[in-house]
Amino acid sequence: MKGFMIAAPASGSGKTTVTLGLLRALKRRGEALAPVKAGPDYIDPAYHKAASGVDCFNLDPWAMRPELISALSSRMTESGARLLVAEGMMGLFDGAMDGKGSSADLARLLDLPVVLVVDCARQSHSIAALVWGFSQFRKDVLIAGIILNRVGSSRHEAMLRGALEPLRIPVLGALPRDTALSLPERHLGLVQAGEHSDLESFLEHAADTMETHIDLDALQTIWSRPKRFDAMANVPRLKPLGNHIAVARDDAFAFAYAHLFEGWRRRGVEISFFSPLGDESPRQDADAIYLPGGYPELHAGRLAQAGRFQAGIREAAARGVTVYGECGGYMVLGESLQDAEGVAHPMLGLLQLETSFAKRKLHLGYRVLEPLEGSPWTEPLKAHEFHYASIVREGKADRLFRVRDAVGDDVGEAGLRVGSVSGSFMHVIDFCGEKA
């Protein structure tokens, strides 16, 4: 499988729009695509899937073992993909607190040439210094092409190309400023793909723009040589929560990693889905229930009125079924959730937890988790935390994890457990050890 990475000097440069437009344009050309998102982001992969028609995997060089990244890449090849298109996160060299786990690390690991998307809106000749610095910063990462974004005029484009010419890095195209290529945002990033009012028209317009302003034939010449990956079957995976896992899935519970489901299915686990917003209950024969993260704060009123959903979860918990919630799912397992307007909505009441968005506080970063006694997890884990919720009250039930940050500093214990019900704000990505 061949591939390349779309990256940028900083967030907000336009790499997501460029990636989506290229995915749709390459799909039109009949390419067998494997979309990838670097890092822990949940939202962009849904856009990648909409643009390409193919499931997008997160590949996270900080939180995932290298052999898992290789195995997931192998799985894409097994599924018939021939071209891996990766979108970076933040700036190319940005990662955890110590810089590890960057998009550049993923490009190096997978031997991907990098196409750098540069926001040119407020610069001309200075672009040469920026691109030269990025091309020289790490010799193990190849900047193979440049896409000029938000170019103001043909004169502006000529100045930019002239400044870059001595660097001998191909300029693959110049995209004009176009407000129609902006994606709507909210506090955790982009609005979810399923909530975009006219996503298909946006993707078609983005693809038309890429086909008009980017030399796709020149892009094809920089795709990396084929690379072999380790077989998925040889790589241990994260232990599943049960033999039949019922997963909440709708606009309130949309943040679940595709690689977790892929790994669990390969271990023979049955996965079924239900919609709390549709007032659906998990299947009675499930021996585990997973409430992933999402935006329950935007739907708290509907969740509070979802009687069948609430009764189904409470009944399962009473039978000793494993019930596990992450971030938004953790908040829903609590007693109440206060929305941004300060209105408190009753939740499931299975954990002594009250949360609020009336006074937002950012919690962000990679985490290493040591499961405590009674946790449904049995091995040290790598995870990510990203939310704006404030804890109003957290009871004295058993804690779930001992937590360290990305550089190893102890940040205390986190999560709650009462019987078979547990949860925390941490999004589990992979395990740290060598055995599942």
From Swiss-Prot:
SUPFAM superfamilies for the chain: Class I glutamine amidotransferase-like, P-loop containing nucleoside triphosphate hydrolases
Coiled coil residues, start to end: none
Enzyme class name: ligase
Site features described as Increases nucleophilicity of active site Cys, chain residue numbers: H427
Keyword GTP-binding (UniProt): no
Active-site residues per Swiss-Prot or TrEMBL entry: C327
Domain of life: Bacteria
Keywords for the protein's UniProt record, in alphabetical order: ATP-binding, Cobalamin biosynthesis, Glutamine amidotransferase, Ligase, Magnesium, Nucleotide-binding
E.C. number: 6.3.5.9
Pfam families reported for this sequence: CbiA, GATase_3
TM segment ranges: none
Pathway(s) of this molecule: Cofactor biosynthesis; adenosylcobalamin biosynthesis; cob(II)yrinate a,c-diamide from precorrin-2 (aerobic route): step 9/10
InterPro entries for the chain: CbiA/CobB_synth, Class_I_gatase-like, CobQ/CobB/MinD/ParA_Nub-bd_dom, GATase_3, P-loop_NTPase
Catalytic activity field: hydrogenobyrinate + 2 L-glutamine + 2 ATP + 2 H2O = hydrogenobyrinate a,c-diamide + 2 L-glutamate + 2 ADP + 2 phosphate + 2 H(+)
Gene Ontology MF annotations: ATP binding; cobyrinic acid a,c-diamide synthase activity; hydrogenobyrinic acid a,c-diamide synthase (glutamine-hydrolysing) activity
Cofactor(s) essential for the protein: Mg(2+)
Biological-process GO terms, alphabetical: cobalamin biosynthetic process
Domain GATase cobBQ-type: 244-435
Additional information: The a and c carboxylates of hydrogenobyrinate are activated for nucleophilic attack via formation of a phosphorylated intermediate by ATP. CobB catalyzes first the amidation of the c-carboxylate, and then that of the a-carboxylate.
Entry similarity comment: Belongs to the CobB/CbiA family.
NCBIfam families named among the record's database cross-references: cobB (TIGR00379), PRK01077.1 (NF002204)
UniProt note: domains: Comprises of two domains. The C-terminal domain contains the binding site for glutamine and catalyzes the hydrolysis of this substrate to glutamate and ammonia. The N-terminal domain is anticipated to bind ATP and hydrogenobyrinate and catalyzes the ultimate synthesis of the diamide product. The ammonia produced via the glutaminase domain is probably translocated to the adjacent domain via a molecular tunnel, where it reacts with an activated intermediate.
Job of this protein: Catalyzes the ATP-dependent amidation of the two carboxylate groups at positions a and c of hydrogenobyrinate, using either L-glutamine or ammonia as the nitrogen source.
Protein name from the UniProt record: Hydrogenobyrinate a,c-diamide synthase
Taxonomic source organism: Brucella anthropi (strain ATCC 49188 / DSM 6882 / CCUG 24695 / JCM 21032 / LMG 3331 / NBRC 15819 / NCTC 12168 / Alc 37) (Ochrobactrum anthropi)
Gene designation: cobB
